[in-house]
Amino acid sequence: MDIDPYKEFGATVELLSFLPSDFFPSVRDLLDTASALYREALESPEHCSPHHTALRQAILCWGELMTLATWVGVNLEDPASRDLVVSYVNTNMGLKFRQLLWFHISCLTFGRETVIEYLVSFGVWIRTPPAYRPPNAPILSTLPETTVVRRRGRSPRRRTPSPRRRRSQSPRRRRSQSRESQC
């Protein structure tokens, strides 16, 4: 079976694979971040969101994997075999967990649409030859908070901006009213 854990969230394993493996923080740092930001929601019996559910499952699976790793470490007597198992877990499974934890924590922190736009932007940036791309990669935290991803189809008609009108010297509204309307 070929199961993509990101599909229902609008992303794919391939989209996350554009990010280099050293991009993702350690599992310990990601678990600490999830705990600091979302402990109450993760421990709650209430359903919060699909991202919370996925994060809960990833955290539980990581715990089980660490239990297995401890068992292997205690019961596998050959040091070379033990090192191979630990290396495999850290390299392959560790990266998958780091990607999964990062994705769901980022979606909860920045919003799913922003994270997906970031992944697409980074994917475009990394595939563009160095001579033709900006020197710095996109950064997730600097993307606008209200990013609009346009659907394919008719593009909206562009309007030319109207010339600015000169303001009269006598204000029509009192200042206190204009401040209230900005909320």
UniProtKB/Swiss-Prot annotation:
Function: Self assembles to form an icosahedral capsid. Most capsids appear to be large particles with an icosahedral symmetry of T=4 and consist of 240 copies of capsid protein, though a fraction forms smaller T=3 particles consisting of 180 capsid proteins. Entering capsids are transported along microtubules to the nucleus. Phosphorylation of the capsid is thought to induce exposure of nuclear localization signal in the C-terminal portion of the capsid protein that allows binding to the nuclear pore complex via the importin (karyopherin-) alpha and beta.
Name of the gene this protein is made from: C
PTM per Swiss-Prot/TrEMBL: Phosphorylated by host SRPK1, SRPK2, and maybe protein kinase C or GAPDH. Phosphorylation is critical for pregenomic RNA packaging. Protein kinase C phosphorylation is stimulated by HBx protein and may play a role in transport of the viral genome to the nucleus at the late step during the viral replication cycle.
GO biological process annotation, one example: symbiont entry into host cell
SUPFAM superfamilies per the UniProt record, alphabetical: Hepatitis B viral capsid (hbcag)
Region RNA binding: start-end pairs: 177-183
Name of the protein described by the UniProt record: Capsid protein
Lineage: Viruses, Riboviria, Pararnavirae, Artverviricota, Revtraviricetes
Entries under Pfam families matching the protein: Hepatitis_core
Record HAMAP family: HBV_HBEAG
Subunit note: Homodimerizes, then multimerizes. Interacts with cytosol exposed regions of viral L glycoprotein present in the reticulum-to-Golgi compartment. Interacts with human FLNB. Phosphorylated form interacts with host importin alpha; this interaction depends on the exposure of the NLS, which itself depends upon genome maturation and/or phosphorylation of the capsid protein. Interacts with host NUP153.
